[in-house]
């Protein structure tokens, strides 16, 4: 736990109350009120953080819509970050869907309408020659984790322009709530490169740069200016790319992953949590991942990232790469990806099926999802299409004909874009399918039996990766580190008692889970020579030292 010794600060009076990282509100002691010129600025009664949190929760429950609850929670975050995270800690299962998916999607769409206070940095293309100055202007100086987006592919909602800032803000809140990384170390950044969303361009309330998106060399040069400025300002930072369009996501990751410690959560984080969930689901039915035939609906960067991670895991279980690739089938709107197709994305090419391997298939119909499920005898189905309702009853019944307990993972966010609801899958499979989703869903029921729906959410993985990187002081994130995170999640899932239908442990244990994943990631970083060797005892000590808890510290006054 980060030390709880007194903190010496130069702020006083209203300036202190307006500093979210330091504000304690009604919890300032009598001595602090005198020392920091706060006497008379606060109600007389001195409260504990528990009392403040109880009031905040009472106020939260008074709102009826999730959007209003999100706005209220963001207001607390922007006025008192310690209280914000204490409230999350006390009610994490209820609050997480409000600060992140699914509610954050609506918040991104309405960002300019609900904007209250500044948070993070907005780096616009017209001001690209001032990036160094902008990074110096950040209110947080000792930044260790950055989440950056350009707002082009927000969840399943597409181009949201600067509204995409809601995602880095939400992600970093989870780095703290789940992974114990101090909010003082976290910085959300929005790269404002314009928007192609005409609705936003026509909206008089839109606060971003009103211009079509830049692309090509202009875009790449701008991102490079940003990356080089970050390297100068915080050379040891962990930078997470978030919600970039697939034509930019993979090239940016490949270009910069050896230049600074960075990863793309949509590609690598989604892959790690998906594979961890899949391994755990296979353990639920006493099988290995390498025994499965797997189909993906959606062959974008996220789906292909998961597929490549699955192939690596199959190889760890004893298959050759060629054998593993024959068991993974990618389906997009044009059907099954095969080596006869042209104009495929570079990251899709290694995942095509050879026409020679499927020459015995019945091709009298288009090789769409239903045909692939039937002819490839699919046992695991991933949904990463961002399109509602594409998992049909025919598809699920075909899965059930291939295996007694098919694994169905409709991962698209938000809930309005899910390929099938868990209740639909449960009904069509007559309670046989093992289901996990990308966003939270209520329990399903079938013939009087209730089944819990696990949320295959990146929040199970990326906070632990971040904590592990910081604890090990890693200089990069390898594929092996991501695989270690997946395996750790699966192993942890076996340890916890779970409700019927559940694959992953309850989210209320997320901090314990993140610590264990962080330890596995840090060990792998050392093994991969991306971090200096350290004893297990010292590594555990570092993890504890980096784990921030939402508690108020005593303040002592000092001068600038």
From Swiss-Prot:
Protein name: NAD-dependent malic enzyme
Enzyme Commission identifier(s): 1.1.1.38
Species: Psychrobacter cryohalolentis (strain ATCC BAA-1226 / DSM 17306 / VKM B-2378 / K5)
Xref: SUPFAM superfamilies: Aminoacid dehydrogenase-like, N-terminal domain, NAD(P)-binding Rossmann-fold domains
Keyword Transit peptide: no
Requisite cofactors: Mg(2+); Mn(2+)
Claim: Aminoacyl-tRNA synthetase is one of the keywords in the record: no
InterPro entries: Aminoacid_DH-like_N_sf, Malic_enzyme_CS, Malic_N_dom, Malic_N_dom_sf, Malic_NAD-bd, Malic_OxRdtase, NAD(P)-bd_dom_sf, NAD_malic_enz_proteobac
Pfam families: malic, Malic_M
Any GO MF annotation of the entry: oxaloacetate decarboxylase activity
Assigned protein family: Belongs to the malic enzymes family.
Matches recorded under CDD domains: NAD_bind_1_malic_enz
């Amino acid at each position: 736990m980060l030390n709880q010794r007194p903190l010496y600060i130069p702020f006083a009076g209203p300036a202190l109350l307006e500093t979210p990282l330091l504000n304690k509100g009604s919890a300032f002691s009598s001595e602090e009120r005198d020392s920091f010129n706060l006497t008379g600025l606060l109600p007389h009664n001195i409260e504990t953080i528990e009392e403040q949190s109880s009031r905040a929760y009472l106020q939260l429950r008074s709102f009826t819509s999730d959007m209003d609850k999100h706005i209220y929670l963001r207001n607390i975050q922007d006025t008192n970050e310690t209280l914000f995270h204490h409230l999350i800690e006390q009610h994490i299962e209820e609050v997480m869907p409000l600060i992140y998916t699914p509610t954050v999607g609506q918040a991104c769409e309405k960002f300019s309408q609900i904007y209250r206070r500044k948070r993070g940095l907005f780096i616009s293309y017209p001001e690209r020659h001032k990036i160094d100055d902008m990074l110096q202007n950040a209110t947080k100086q000792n930044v260790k984790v950055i989440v950056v987006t350009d707002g082009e592919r927000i969840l399943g909602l597409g181009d949201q322009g600067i509204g995409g800032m809601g995602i880095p803000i939400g992600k970093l809140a989870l780095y703290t709530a789940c992974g114990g990384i101090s909010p003082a170390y976290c910085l959300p950044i929005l790269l404002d490169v314009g928007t192609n969303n005409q609705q936003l361009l026509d909206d008089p309330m839109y606060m971003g740069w009103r211009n079509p998106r830049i692309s090509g060399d202009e875009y790449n040069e701008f991102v490079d200016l940003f990356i080089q400025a970050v390297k100068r300002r915080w050379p040891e930072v962990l930078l997470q790319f978030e919600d970039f369009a697939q034509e930019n996501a993979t090239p940016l990751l490949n270009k910069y992953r050896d230049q600074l410690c960075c990863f793309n959560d949509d590609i690598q984080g989604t892959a790690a949590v998906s594979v961890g969930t899949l391994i755990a689901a296979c353990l639920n039915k006493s099988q290995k991942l390498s025994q499965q035939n797997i189909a993906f609906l959606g062959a974008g960067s996220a789906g292909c990232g998961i597929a490549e991670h699955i192939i690596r895991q199959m190889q760890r279980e004893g298959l050759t790469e060629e054998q593993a690739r024959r068991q993974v089938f990618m389906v997009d709107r044009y059907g099954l990806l095969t080596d006869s197709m042209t104009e495929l994305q570079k990251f899709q090419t290694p995942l095509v099926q050879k026409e020679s391997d499927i020459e015995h298939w019945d091709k009298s119909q288009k090789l769409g999802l239903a045909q692939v499920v039937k002819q490839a005898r699919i046992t695991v189905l991933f949904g990463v299409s961002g399109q509602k309702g594409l998992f049909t009853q025919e598809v699920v019944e075909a899965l059930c004909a291939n295996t007694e307990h098919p694994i169905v993972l409709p991962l698209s966010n938000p809930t309005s874009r899910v390929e099938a609801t868990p209740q639909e899958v449960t009904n069509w499979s007559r309670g046989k399918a093992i289901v996990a989703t990308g966003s939270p869903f209520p329990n399903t029921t079938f013939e009087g039996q209730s089944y819990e729906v696990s949320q295959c959410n990146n929040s199970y993985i990326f906070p632990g990766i971040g904590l592990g990187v910081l604890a090990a002081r890693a200089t990069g994130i390898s594929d092996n580190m991501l695989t270690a995170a997946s395996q750790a999640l699966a192993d942890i899932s076996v340890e916890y008692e779970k409700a019927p239908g559940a694959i992953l442990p309850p989210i209320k244990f997320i901090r314990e889970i993140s610590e264990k994943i962080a330890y596995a990631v840090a060990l792998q970083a050392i093994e991969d020579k991306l971090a200096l060797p350290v004893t297990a005892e010292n590594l555990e000590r570092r993890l504890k030292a980096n784990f921030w808890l939402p508690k108020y510290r005593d303040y002592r006054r000092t001068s600038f």
